[in-house]
Every structure is written in structure tokens, then in C-alpha cells.
């Protein structure tokens, strides 16, 4: 099997396609959460702690000189990113927890016993015939 055909067989497998879809949806979800945190959560939080905008929090290590830009430790963006991560992690936790509950409910549902095989049916018939013969 050639390299190209092996790659094609690998690429069209369900797991690879599912993973690609998951990555794309995850990236879109990340943008939604970043917007939610930056535009909805952080402004009121900044108001509560005295009007601080987290994205602007920084420590200047070295002032700008001539053409050289300032060296800045932008810890506000880091705080923003940590909050994004925590919200995404919490959302994933809730989703996984819901899936696990659904799986538990499926596992708890009693399943019907499997239908007897043809061999089992024949053995039961033989057993029943032997019982009736022994009684007469």
C-alpha cells in the first residue's frame, strides 16, 4: 500500500474527522468564552475592585528609549487568560459530567436477556421431552 493511500485511509477514518471537527468547534468555543470573559465578566469585576481594567495591568520593567519600545510585564492579560481558562475548564467539566450521567442512566437501564440460541432451544426441548417421558 502506497504512502498516499495509507494517508488517505488514515485521514478519512471516523476518529480523525471527529477530532478535526472537535478542534474547530473548540477554537470557536474559545473565542466565545474569551469574548464572554472580556466583554461581560471583566468590566463588572473591574468596577467591583475599583475600576481596574485587567487587560491594562502591567509593570514597566524598562521605559521606552528612542526607537526601543518599553519592556513591559503585562500580567493583566495573564489574569484575563487564566479566567478564560477557568471558565472553559468549568464548561467542559459540566459537559463531561452531563455525559457521564447519561451513560450511567443507560447502564442502569435493565436490558432484556438475549434470546436463546437454536442450540439452547433444542436442549430445552430435549429436557422437556425427557421430563414427560420420566413421568409416564
Curated annotation (Swiss-Prot):
InterPro entries, A to Z: Mechanosensitive_channel_CS (IPR019823), MS_channel (IPR001185), MSC/AndL (IPR037673), MscL_channel (IPR036019)
Principal location listed in the UniProt entry: membrane
GO CC annotation terms, alphabetical: plasma membrane
Disulphide bonds in the chain: none
Subcellular location as annotated: Cell inner membrane
Record protein name field: Large-conductance mechanosensitive channel
Membrane topology of the entry: Multi-pass membrane protein
